[in-house]
């Protein structure tokens, strides 16, 4: 936990030392935290999806192929949410609409 706090504080210091603009530095911090949370949520969702598919296949091996197809569709939808977060993060970092 101490390493994570140290990393966040050091990134905040790096962000605040750039130009002195508060909006830009807050955007960098928010982008990092937002993308990290999106990736964390996506990873948890993918893990739960895979665990449920493995459990379902173990209980009834006959429906394994149907479960795999459904799992891949679900994984694509979960990953799409993380990609949307990445796109929003890149917009906030490089074409920040709050800077005017």
UniProtKB/Swiss-Prot annotation:
Site positions for Reversibly protonated during proton transport: 79
Leader sequence residues: none
Membrane topology: Multi-pass membrane protein
Pfam families with a match to the protein in the record: ATP-synt_C
CDD domains: ATP-synt_Fo_c
Compartment(s): Cell inner membrane
Main localisation: membrane
InterPro entries in the cross-refs: ATP_synth_csu_bac/chlpt, ATP_synth_F0_csu, ATP_synth_F0_csu_DDCD_BS, ATP_synth_F0_csu_sf, ATPase_proteolipid_c-like_dom, F/V-ATP_Csub_sf
One of the record's GO molecular function terms: lipid binding
Transmembrane segments: 27-47, 72-92
Entry's Gene Ontology cellular component terms: plasma membrane; proton-transporting ATP synthase complex; proton-transporting two-sector ATPase complex, proton-transporting domain
Family: Belongs to the ATPase C chain family.
Protein name (record): ATP synthase subunit c
Keyword tags: ATP synthesis, Cell inner membrane, Cell membrane, CF(0), Hydrogen ion transport, Ion transport, Lipid-binding, Membrane, Transmembrane, Transmembrane helix, Transport
The organism's taxonomic lineage, starting at the top: Bacteria, Pseudomonadati, Campylobacterota, Epsilonproteobacteria, Campylobacterales
NCBIfam families noted in UniProt: ATP_synt_c, PRK08482.1
Role noted for this protein: F(1)F(0) ATP synthase produces ATP from ADP in the presence of a proton or sodium gradient. F-type ATPases consist of two structural domains, F(1) containing the extramembraneous catalytic core and F(0) containing the membrane proton channel, linked together by a central stalk and a peripheral stalk. During catalysis, ATP synthesis in the catalytic domain of F(1) is coupled via a rotary mechanism of the central stalk subunits to proton translocation.
Oligomer status and interactors: F-type ATPases have 2 components, F(1) - the catalytic core - and F(0) - the membrane proton channel. F(1) has five subunits: alpha(3), beta(3), gamma(1), delta(1), epsilon(1). F(0) has three main subunits: a(1), b(2) and c(10-14). The alpha and beta chains form an alternating ring which encloses part of the gamma chain. F(1) is attached to F(0) by a central stalk formed by the gamma and epsilon chains, while a peripheral stalk is formed by the delta and b chains.
């Amino acid at each position: 936990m101490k390493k994570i706090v140290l990393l966040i504080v050091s990134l905040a210091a790096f962000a605040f030392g750039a130009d002195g603009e508060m909006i830009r530095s807050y955007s960098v911090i928010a982008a990092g935290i937002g993308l990290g949370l999106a990736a964390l949520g996506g990873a948890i969702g993918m893990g739960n999806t895979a665990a449920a598919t493995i459990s379902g296949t173990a209980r009834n091996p006959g429906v394994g192929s149907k479960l795999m197809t459904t799992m891949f569709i679900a994984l694509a939808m979960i990953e799409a949410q993380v990609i949307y977060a990445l796109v929003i993060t890149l917009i906030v970092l490089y074409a920040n609409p709050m800077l005017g």
